[in-house]
UniProtKB/Swiss-Prot annotation:
Enzyme class, first EC level, given as a word: ligase
Sequence motif 'KMSKS' region, residues: 278-282
Provenance organism: Methanococcus maripaludis (strain DSM 14266 / JCM 13030 / NBRC 101832 / S2 / LL)
More info: Able to charge E.coli tRNA(Lys) in vitro.
Stated name of the protein: Lysine--tRNA ligase
Amino acid sequence: MHWADATSEKIMKKRNAEEYVVSSGITPSGHIHIGNARETLTADAVYKGMLKKGAEAKLIFIADDYDPLRKLYPFLPKEFEKYIGMPLSEIPCPQGCCKSYADHFLMPFLNSLEDLGVEITTHRANECYKAGMYNDAIITALENRLKIKELLDSYRKEPLADDWYPLNVVCEKCGKMHETKVINYNSEDKTITYVCKCGFENTVKPFNGIGKLPWRVDWPARWNIFGVTAEPMGKDHAASGGSYDTGIKIARQIFNYQAPEKMVYEWIQLKVGDKAMPMSSSSGVVFAVKDWTEICHPEVLRFLILKGKPTKHIDFDLKAISNLVDDYDELERKYFELIEKQKTEELNDNENEKISLYELVTPKIPERLPLQVAYRFCSIIAQIALDKETQKIDMERVFDILGRNGYNPAEFSEYDKSRLEKRLYMSKKWASDYGENLEINDLDQAKEQYETLSEEQKAWLKAFSKEVENIEIDANTIHELMYETATKLNLAPKEAFVASYKILLGKNYGPKLGSFLASLKKEFVIGRFNLTE
């Protein structure tokens, strides 16, 4: 059984609720990266597991856009220093293209969720507070101030100040919430008196966005407000004495609510060189979800995140993304094989889990096994078939190349062609930004490389080019011909390959050579190996 099915089953048995609400949330203080997406996709997987079992369930997302800007992040201009302490929803867009700072970072993520197959109801904290959804919780927190302080202090080395109040007020003059302090609460008329470092002081009702609960009180309050029954959380929140531990007690003793079941997830680390570093918007170590959808299929991101348990950390290497796509393609082939197999045989647990995983990570399952052209090969084809003036890929050239590599383009469905074209453009961008750009040497560069070769390699180049004149060029024929001609001249095949890569790319290595040469025009291959083109 896949972990998402097992988790949803466990939660349903424990809670036995009429309706389940699975929640996730993010503070849009910077670029929302694939590490953040792990929380939302984990929630989505468990939610889908509940639906599979016939349960009534909802999936919600809380955008914590009423949190303050905490510091001047490296990606912000110096002038944004004046906004530190203001709610993210009230700060202008750093590039002037969105309604607010929060929207600038939030909207690309929300827009990508549809591509990722996530259907979710979004609640923005700033709108919820301003609409009065937290008003009752604010009163409850203020009237139970000392009890909340006692609960929080039991987990703290240093107790909170005796005059602490569980409320952050947005100053009506300067708009900041990190420099205000509540100095009194009047339980009769439900007003608070606050002072701000800017010199402003006022007595107001702390409702409809005037006040915001601090995180350790806000979280259990929202569980109650939205009826949350399950929520993924990072290991920092789930640690002993963390905000989940205090949240359990505040939810039960202050808001009379049972805390949701926790689902702890590990970080996704971004591999930079030989080091793997935890992703963090504030540190600038990020790979945004919107960037993923430019270089790879959304279902492959779901596959990366959901194939293993959430408690397993993931090292993500951008240079190895082609291997990840290969693994997804292998799962896809296995899925359609097992769908046929189960018509006549009973599948074992491992086979059923493969079916569950593919269905979970693939939002739109094709009717039959679609065309699969390896991602790395697509990156090569895309660069060869690219019109440098228009930056468009010549699909007729692509079909010609594939025809010489064992494919039959006449059998491609419209779905196949559409998916192939997407993969070509995505893999081209990947090769350009993160992989290896395919830059074929010009003739002068090829001649320079030629002079570095042994006499045996030079003789082989001429013999090989002569033989190519007499064949119909395709990947297998080219591959066999390279071995045959090298063997005849007593040249190690490896040396023939090195000679080919050097006069083509100026390197000792390169893409799979048979497929690569079959992707080029026959006249060019003959001319290059003769050093005339």
